[in-house]
Amino acid sequence: MGFSSIWHWIIVLVVVLLLFGAGKIPRLMGDVAKGVKAFKKGMADDEDDEAASVSAERRGIEDGKPAQTIYPPQQPQQPQQPPQQPPVHRDDAPRG
């Protein structure tokens, strides 16, 4: 007895209607549709951005100019010396 019986699907449908109500289901489906549309739009925007960057790279190659890599400015680093500890003076004279 799997979920291939029509009675199982009717029971599932009734439970879903009882949990969410008849008015909430269309709103949920509308929200899902909006989410899918936003996802597709985002994917299309990413593809457009990628295509624009590829075409910009090709224009640079077509112009005969090598692509320039911009590096952030770096501060010169000076070698650090380990901290010097002050010498320890012992008093060799016996105490007492």
Swiss-Prot record:
InterPro entries documented for this protein: TatA/B/E, TatA/E
Region listing for Disordered, in residue ranges: 42-96
Cystine connections: none
One GO MF term attached to the UniProt entry: protein transmembrane transporter activity
GO cellular component terms attached to this protein's record: TAT protein transport complex
Primary role: Part of the twin-arginine translocation (Tat) system that transports large folded proteins containing a characteristic twin-arginine motif in their signal peptide across membranes. TatA could form the protein-conducting channel of the Tat system.
UniProt protein name: Sec-independent protein translocase protein TatA
Native organism: Rhodospirillum rubrum (strain ATCC 11170 / ATH 1.1.1 / DSM 467 / LMG 4362 / NCIMB 8255 / S1)
Source taxonomy: Bacteria, Pseudomonadati, Pseudomonadota, Alphaproteobacteria, Rhodospirillales
Gene that encodes the chain: tatA
